[in-house]
A protein has these predicted regions:
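Short, compositionally biased "basic patch" segments
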Residues: 1-30
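Long, repeat-rich segments with strong aromatic
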Residues: 48-49
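PLD/PLD-like phosphodiesterase catalytic module centered on the HKD motif
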Residues: 1, 9-11, 41, 53-180
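Secondary-structure "cap/kink" motif recognition
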Residues: 27, 32-41
Length: 180
């Protein structure tokens, strides 16, 4: 079966929508491409995040450029030997994990917000297998290159701020800092 090409230039309302499916569309490259465009901040909540996924390197590069990078990881997944926790903390990326006793058993989100202007959601864990061998998906909502349509910018910002508020809520209500 021939892989389908990604859907390009599709809007819902005023927000650009770009669905991608792994392994055919290499969603990891889309994450990296969008993080390279970031100007101020990257916020994320991820269930599984492995070292050398490519996404961790892009976050480290963003932090080295002076961007704020903040994330929430699942407690059990973050403690695995293959997890990106140490790489990210070494780069001074602010990390949290779900606390025990809060009623939150797992952080199962796969959610990223870039510059409060773009939201990336889906089933895609931040791992090599998710990109190469799993059937996974992401939906990119927004366009970081959009600068000439105030109504569309407001719509994507509203959506991104709503998603970041969920990340912030989880950190405040159920999170604890990862210090090492």
């Amino acid at each position: 079966m021939v892989p389908r090409k990604p859907l390009e230039d599709h809007d819902v309302g005023l927000v650009r929508v770009k669905p991608l499916f792994a392994p055919d569309h290499a969603p990891e490259m889309e994450f990296i491409k969008q993080m390279i465009k970031a100007k101020n901040r990257i916020d994320f909540a991820a269930f599984t995040f492995s070292q050398s996924s490519g996404i961790d390197d892009a976050m480290v590069n963003a932090r080295e450029k002076g961007l704020s990078v903040t994330g929430l990881l699942d407690r059990r997944q973050a403690n695995q030997s293959w997890a990106a926790k140490h790489t990210l903390r070494t780069a001074d990326i602010t990390l949290h994990r779900n606390r025990t006793g809060t009623g939150v058993r797992k952080v199962h989100h796969k959610l990223m917000v870039i510059d409060d202007r773009m939201t990336i959601i889906g089933s895609f864990n931040y791992t090599g297998p998710a990109n190469l061998v799993n059937d996974e998906n992401i939906i990119v909502l927004g366009d970081l290159d959009l600068h000439d349509n105030p109504a569309a910018e407001d719509a994507q910002r509203s959506l991104a701020e709503y998603a970041r508020a969920e990340i912030d809520r989880m950190i405040v209500e159920a999170g604890e800092p990862i210090l090492t």
